[in-house]
Amino acid sequence: MPASPLRLGVNVDHVATLRNARGGRNPDPVRAALLAIEAGADGITAHLREDRRHIRDEDMARLKAEISKPLNFEMAATDDMMRISLATRPHAVCLVPERRQEVTTEGGLDVVGQHNALAPYIARLNDAGIRVSLFIAADPAQIEMAARLRAPVIEIHTGAWCDAVVDGHTEKADAEWKRIVAGAKLAKDAGLEVHAGHGLDYATAETIAALPDIMELNIGYYMIGEALFVGLAETVRSMRAAMDRGRSRA
């Protein structure tokens, strides 16, 4: 039986990073989202950070109002973000760790250590009909706790694997890859839907697309950088093609 289709979520955070570097309204992350969808994206991801360093509150409202595909709202588990997410009512919320000092999300949520704090946020989002995902490492204890907390989805943090691949650290890349493969299977067997993201490029997206347990990839920084050279629509089409090549081997 062929594997289920693999969805592509395009993260538009770094369109907003470019805009905010100069101020004003351009480039517009909502326009980027619309172009990405037209070119074949299955959904849009945006991370509203507490310091508003890229995506702003009004961007989230406009994305929800203007795009025709599912909106995945990445956020820290705080009361302020909960209020905004319940007002925005995106298709999905992905709970992520967040530190003001970090340049990008540096690791996965510690679901094991923070399960008591996370549980009420997961329950409220579930009750509101918003699909909840937890951004975690491919660690058995974290995956098992995610299932116990009744989060229907996990997103596996692929950053360590992608960095090792790019840096040519073959042994580390192989070890991280084995963790991802095992983690995706464990999560699927536990009844979780499995997504993946962070640091993916054409090559690593094609590789991970061959894992039938993974249903969605969320990719942003690489695609926005590549779009500077070939355009966003072409980048989305090329990423979609890379994913499809990988999926054909699942």
Curated annotation (Swiss-Prot):
The keyword Transferase belongs to this UniProt entry's keyword annotation: yes
Top-level lineage group: Bacteria
The protein, known as: Pyridoxine 5'-phosphate synthase
Reactions accelerated catalytically: 3-amino-2-oxopropyl phosphate + 1-deoxy-D-xylulose 5-phosphate = pyridoxine 5'-phosphate + phosphate + 2 H2O + H(+)
Keyword Cytoplasm: yes
Pathway where it operates: Cofactor biosynthesis; pyridoxine 5'-phosphate biosynthesis; pyridoxine 5'-phosphate from D-erythrose 4-phosphate: step 5/5
CDD domains with a match to the protein in the record: PNPsynthase
Subcellular location: Cytoplasm
Main location as per UniProt: cytoplasm
Quaternary organization: Homooctamer; tetramer of dimers.
Gene Ontology biological process: pyridoxine biosynthetic process
InterPro entries linked to this entry: Aldolase_TIM (IPR013785), PyrdxlP_synth_PdxJ (IPR004569), Pyridoxine-5'_phos_synth (IPR036130)
Binding of 3-amino-2-oxopropyl phosphate, residues: 11, 22, 199, 220-221
PANTHER family: PYRIDOXINE 5'-PHOSPHATE SYNTHASE
UniProt-annotated site: Transition state stabilizer, residues: 155
Native organism taxonomy: Bacteria, Pseudomonadati, Pseudomonadota, Alphaproteobacteria, Hyphomicrobiales
Documented EC number(s): 2.6.99.2
Keywords, sorted A to Z: Cytoplasm, Pyridoxine biosynthesis, Transferase
A GO cellular-component term linked to this record: cytosol
Binding site for 1-deoxy-D-xylulose 5-phosphate: 13-14, 49, 54, 104
Function recorded in the entry: Catalyzes the complicated ring closure reaction between the two acyclic compounds 1-deoxy-D-xylulose-5-phosphate (DXP) and 3-amino-2-oxopropyl phosphate (1-amino-acetone-3-phosphate or AAP) to form pyridoxine 5'-phosphate (PNP) and inorganic phosphate.
UniProt record similarity statement: Belongs to the PNP synthase family.
GO MF term list: pyridoxine 5'-phosphate synthase activity
Active site residues according to the UniProt entry: 47, 74, 198
